[in-house]
Amino acid sequence: MAHETMSFQAEVKQLLHLMIHSLYSNKEIFLRELVSNASDAADKLRFEGLADNALYEDDPNVRIRIGYDKAARTITIDDNGIGMSRDEAIANLGTIARSGTKEFFTKLSGDQQKDAALIGQFGVGFYSGFIVADKITVETRRAGLPASEAVRWESAGEGDFTIDAIERAQRGTTITLHLREGEDELLSSHRLQSIIQKYSDHIALPILMQKEEWDQEKGEMVLKDEDETVNQASALWTRSKSEVSDEQYTQFYQHIAHDHQDPLTWTHNRVEGRSEYTQLLFVPSHAPFDMWNRDYRGGLKLYVKRVFIMDDAEQLLPQYLRFVKGVVDSADLPLNVSREILQESRDVKAIREGVTKRALSMLEELANAEEDAGKEKYKTFWGAFGQVLKEGLGEDHANRERIAKLLRFASTHGDTDAQDVSLADYVSRMKPEQSRIYYVTADAWQAAKNSPHLEVFRKKGVEVLLLTDRVDEWMLSFLQEFDGKPLASVARGDLDLGELNDEEKKAQEEAGEAIKPVVEKMKEALGDKVKEVRVTFRLTDSPSCLVADDNDMSGYLQRMLKAAGQNAPAMQPILEINPEHALVKQLKADSADFGDWCHLLFDQALLAEGGMLDDPASFVKRTNALLLSRAA
């Protein structure tokens, strides 16, 4: 096929500009990314070779070779992995195929360390070569294609690239970086090896370089005609824990997670019995940018007998643990395992159960840590992934109790929005005569903290959990008790504080009788806005509040469903009034403005719980009229 020039996709031009001008101080990443790509190409060859052994072309020893040429000022990264066809070279090197390109650019922070990590996360690591090179040449042939169908791709990184057909006997890919002026310090075995050992020592594939020895006559290091392996070249998870340093675990995590930060914690063990497998699991220290995207792919890397099978094996983890990164290497699964087989396999079910238990154990160790460092790590974890973990109460009945112990909430015990109170903490502080765990849900911490529903609890010194995450209302349908204590909303039903409010009960009944005519007239005035109007003892400072009936949906949940575009069933709240409040005391059932006062008390209660008025203009008009009548 003739020489052809093509333009880069628009986003690639933007990306090249970023690489060249913004990431120079972190230039070592180019080798990390290109070695990682070569490793992926080897994994793909092994995977496709399971079905077609001819792809190995009588060369089964897969490796990566790195070299340099001082005279030509080039660095070469060569692999004999799967290689690329012409169409694949254009697709992989001329466009960013992955969706979310715009998100990539919005996530750039200007922090070179963080931005460098995003490059790998978005699968655009190839372009990092332009940090140190002003021209890149790629020669490649896909395994299984004839030598005449090899391709040369070349670009100076300025907006276009060329494609040529070439002859190439060896399968795989050779990338040649033509270095920019001032990059000659990279043309050294010692320098390249130090970068490889820093970033790529854990790569399971041997990384070869020409051996270098001191030449006494020349008085310098010279290259020999033999190769040496410059990395450990063994799968890290297959080694004994005692052989792996914390630094090596961290580097391995950063490689598989494309993350520049250290993990919070990890666990590494071999399981024997019904299923045999090795697991190496990590908990990240921050959530990925796309954690809540519908097409987010969580899951672990799956290997079978050390042969890479797939990324993102979602069947090995429940959804609520989708943030966990790592590797599972099974001795039992067939090498031709597919995603469909994974869904039906009993071995996979056993692995999933084991991985889930191990992941929860990791979190329990952090949550129960005595030292400050461990406590801080769990705070970091909860801030990043707490809402995701809450999903587990509905998804994983078998581990519901374990998950409940890991939950953290804000509460009235501390004047802060920090979610650091466990259910066990709450129970340990309960009053002797208290039988329930009380909570309030709201859109925000400030709204929850100032909810009128909390007034009687403050008066009696009873702690209330403040729940403000969007997932909380859903979660509560699966979390009905803890340690034998039922959870109760302070804004639902006829509040019963047990022995804590025996005195108020009698006073409430008497007050209710005294203003019974007013209560009945209020129900008439408000009509179908409310299910009921009644006297309450839960208020001490506010004149009124809205509560949901025992089996009804809360106002907060109704608002949340509407905001999500779902149909929320129309449910009428109960209006509760405080008979001791001055506004309620002055209500007269036969006064001309009685109806306005009733609507004002309802609207105030709705606003206090974070609700929206159906008719704000009428509320303002009514309020002004009542203020004027008082002034007169």
From Swiss-Prot:
It is found in: Cytoplasm. Keywords: ATP-binding, Chaperone, Cytoplasm, Nucleotide-binding, Stress response. InterPro entries: HATPase_C_sf, Heat_shock_protein_90_CS, HSP90_C, Hsp90_fam, Hsp90_N, Ribosomal_Su5_D2-typ_SF. Molecular chaperone. Has ATPase activity. Residues 1-339 are annotated as: A. Homodimer. The gene is htpG. Gene3D superfamilies: 3.30.230.80, 3.40.50.11260, Heat shock protein 90, C-terminal domain, Histidine kinase-like ATPase, C-terminal domain. It comes from the Bacteria. Belongs to the heat shock protein 90 family. GO terms for molecular function: ATP binding; ATP hydrolysis activity; ATP-dependent protein folding chaperone; unfolded protein binding. Residues 340-559 are annotated as: B. This is Chaperone protein HtpG.
